[in-house]
Amino acid sequence: MIGIIFNTYALYKIFCYEQFGFKKNQFIIFLVFNLLSSVIVFAYIFSCGLLYCLPYILCAFWLSGVAYADYVSCNVYEIMEYYAVIPILLSILNIINNGTSYALPKLGAALVTVAAYGIMAKAGVFGEGDSDILSAVCIVYFDAYYNCIFFGLVMVLFVIRNFGYAVKNRVMHGNVRPLVPSIYMGYILMLPFVLGSTPES
């Protein structure tokens, strides 16, 4: 409930904050475009019987909007970071309601892992956006082998991100924000769902 109240207040600040002007409108248009695209994807998934992966594809669309906001305004990006938790909650609810192949102990372990990702993100091991993507995917692919791969990918992307900031500071003189590939890794992790794989029973 506290999280819902905080996110509602954050949404109010985003849409009522006039400082961003035209750039803020660009971000809103881009986000609406992503949401409309997700409706099309929803129709396709429903016809193919792959409804369970909808929240994760929505997560990819949502974080792509966050990535765009990163280039529009740091302030918007910092606020929108907290919104990535919404697809994760949808994913958990989807599993509880429809994921008959998930045992409760497995779901509990997945939730613990999600919390661990969040704590590590706050500790600065990797970005909060990375934590959100990994948490959502981990709920489906909760396996030690996949987790090791995820941690390895995140650590590599963490190095790339810091290298990007170094390039920005030395070459771009702070005028252009570097590409943060860790957010876009969500699309790579969504491929198994798009290709029609199913969670293990």
Predicted regions, residues:
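A membrane-topology feature that recognizes alpha-helical transmembrane segments
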Residues: 1-201
